[in-house]
């Protein structure tokens, strides 16, 4: 599959994300809020689908990067999805050692703590970038969400923290509610070209003002979208 993408003209391959172990801890932080009241109704067994496993483990992911590098001549970009400083550093280094030409940091964080300030959340993002940049030599692109009070300023801070690129925008998992079973159910809805407009707007605003490369994700479906 990867070789066929190169044959079709792809300039680089961005791998799907390796989810850092701290994500499991984050799901448990969110879980109490979503499972509240599940024992109040006989039909409500669980409001939140358990995240017991991922599609591939860390070792298999690293092996896949090595195999991809051996199979193609174009750059292979690893992707790491996580939160904690220690885990980010460990897997960032291992992804580089596996042969990745660059790394995408896909920071996925849902701040459910009402005592946590916006400043503290922003600092956590920036600290992650600094810690990873201090450990790897390959370029690091940060995949971010638009949910910052001042995204333009945050983009500049990401660059100051060492980001070589910004990928806009992360698409958070948004489950649905089954009113009959009183459960939270997965409901993955694919994007359309309309979803690209927010990213296009911000790239147009920031291009030339923030010295960083931009990449747009979500909503790019046709060659017109690419142009």
Where are these regions (language model features)?
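Alpha/beta enzyme core
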Residues: 2-42, 47, 56-217, 221-227
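The substrate-binding groove and active-site-proximal loops of carbohydrate-active enzymes
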Residues: 51
């Amino acid at each position: 599959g990867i070789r066929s993408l190169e044959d079709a003209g792809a300039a680089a391959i961005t791998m799907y994300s390796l989810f850092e172990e701290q994500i499991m801890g984050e799901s448990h932080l969110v879980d109490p809020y979503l499972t509240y009241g599940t024992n109040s109704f006989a039909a409500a067994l669980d409001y939140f689908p358990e995240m017991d496993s991922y599609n591939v483990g860390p070792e298999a992911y690293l092996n896949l990067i090595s195999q991809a590098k051996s199979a193609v001549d174009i750059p292979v970009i690893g992707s790491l999805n996580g939160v904690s400083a220690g885990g980010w550093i460990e897997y960032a280094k291992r992804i580089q050692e596996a042969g990745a030409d660059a790394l995408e940091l896909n920071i996925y964080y849902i701040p459910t703590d009402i005592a946590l300030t916006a400043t503290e959340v922003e600092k956590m993002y920036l600290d992650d970038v600094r810690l990873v940049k201090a450990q790897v030599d390959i370029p690091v692109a940060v995949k971010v969400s638009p949910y910052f009070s001042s995204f333009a300023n945050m983009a500049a801070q990401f660059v100051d923290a060492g980001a070589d690129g910004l990928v806009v925008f992360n698409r958070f998992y948004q489950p649905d509610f089954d009113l009959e079973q009183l459960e939270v159910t997965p409901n993955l809805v694919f994007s359309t070209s309309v979803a690209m407009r927010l990213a296009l707007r911000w790239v147009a605003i920031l291009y030339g003002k923030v010295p960083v490369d931009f990449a747009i994700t979500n909503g790019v479906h046709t060659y017109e979208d690419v142009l």
